[in-house]
Each structure stands twice: as structure tokens, then as C-alpha cells.
Amino acid sequence: MNWKLRLQERLWGLAPWDAQRISDEWFRAHFEYAADVVHNWIGSVLDVRTAQLLNFGCGDGITDLALVLRHGATAIHGVDIRREYAKLPRIAREQLGMARIPAGMTFETITPGAPLAGRRPLVDGIMSWSTFEHVQRDQLAPIFSDLHACLRPGGYFFIQIEPLFYSPFGSHLRRYDEVPWHHLLVSEGELWKVIEAHQGPIDAMETDFGFADFGVDGYKKFVFNEYRALNRLT
């Protein structure tokens, strides 16, 4: 199927898109800010127009899409333990009016801790955005070693971790709790009561495309479980 898309793009170019259509703030933040930060770093050492890139923890793939559309990347393989990227064709259609996502983007669901090295050609650059705080401590060294083995000699690895656990909002729960360092000041049970009692909308920039899958109460439980699973090291 991918070769058909590549042929289409060779003949007619990328599908038309229009950033003026963007209405979702989560999309805007990752399509603009996150992509610009990644490109500022990766683009300073690699030519993204020719580089083979791997995104470890690609999420919904919005940042990858922006790197292709706004910065000229031509080959990005995204991997994640969840399948949020499967929503990208719909998201791109709704937010950009795109009929199809670029052929240079590929995605894969992986098992936590499963090695990637040796399964695909070596890459020029690896990027990871807000992922490693979710990796369990005993998996950190093996995963870093595995990713290093995925890089060509002289390749580059861009890693972003935010927020850091011991920072004011390191719980990743700011969408529900605006008290700085609250996760370090109260018990887990007390913190959950704050999250559970929250009423009203949450910041649009913090409302990802998985929210609708869970519903209001289900999403609270999901993000709180994500907080509980943080490695508390990064």
C-alpha cells in the first residue's frame, strides 16, 4: 500500500493541506511548537530532507506529520506501545483538510522493552518527546542501548523529557491540579481525591485525541494511572 502512496506523491505531490483550518489546541501545540523544537535540534545537525528518522514514543504522530509538511522531512518511522497514531488520517483530515497522510511516514506498535535493533535499516536520527519519564527504571538502560544500536555511526539522538518529576507539575496532572509540587506534598490518595473532584473543562492544550476514548471519569483514571507509573527518576 505504501508504494502506491509514494507513486501518487511522485506524480502529484503531497496531498494539499491548510493550517488555517486548525481548530484543536492539542493539535496546534504539537504541529507547531513541538515540531519546531524538534526541528531546531535535529535540523541543526542533520538534513531532515534526506535523513532517515525514528520517533520513539510517537504518540498520535502529529509532530511527525508537521516535520514532513512544515520542515521537509521525507522518512520518519514512529513506534509506540499504544496505537494513537491510527487516528492520524482522521485527525489530518479534520484539522488540515488532508486527504491522505504522507507516504514517508510509517508507524508500528511495539511491546514495552522489545528490541528494535536489527529489525530495520539503521537511522540517522532518533527523537523522543515526553516518553522516557514513562519508561520503567529497569528498562531505561536496555532501551537506550537498543536505540543506540539503531543509529548509524555518527547519528544523533534528540530526547525531550517534560515535565521532570520533581518540577512543580511533574505529576503530569496539571490539567486537573494547579498546585505546584502537590504530588510531592500530599499522599497518593489525597491527590486522587483532588483529581476525582475536578469539575468543568480542562485546558484545550492538554486534551489529547484519546480523551473521547475514555470519557470524563475514565480519562481521570487513565492519567492518574499514568502518574502512578512514572519512573520518578527523570
Name what the model sees in each region.
Residues 61-115:
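Class I SAM-dependent methyltransferase SAM/SAH-binding core
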Residues 115-126:
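A short acidic, Gly/Pro-enriched loop at the edge of an enzyme's catalytic core
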Residues 50-59, 158-201:
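Conserved class I S-adenosyl-L-methionine
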Residues 6-45:
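Class I SAM-dependent methyltransferase Rossmann-like catalytic core
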Residues 141-153:
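A short glycine-rich, Lys/Arg-flanked "PGG" loop and its adjoining helix->strand segment in the class I
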Residues 225-234:
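Short alpha-helix
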Residues 124-138:
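A short SAM/SAH-binding and catalytic strip from SAM-dependent methyltransferases
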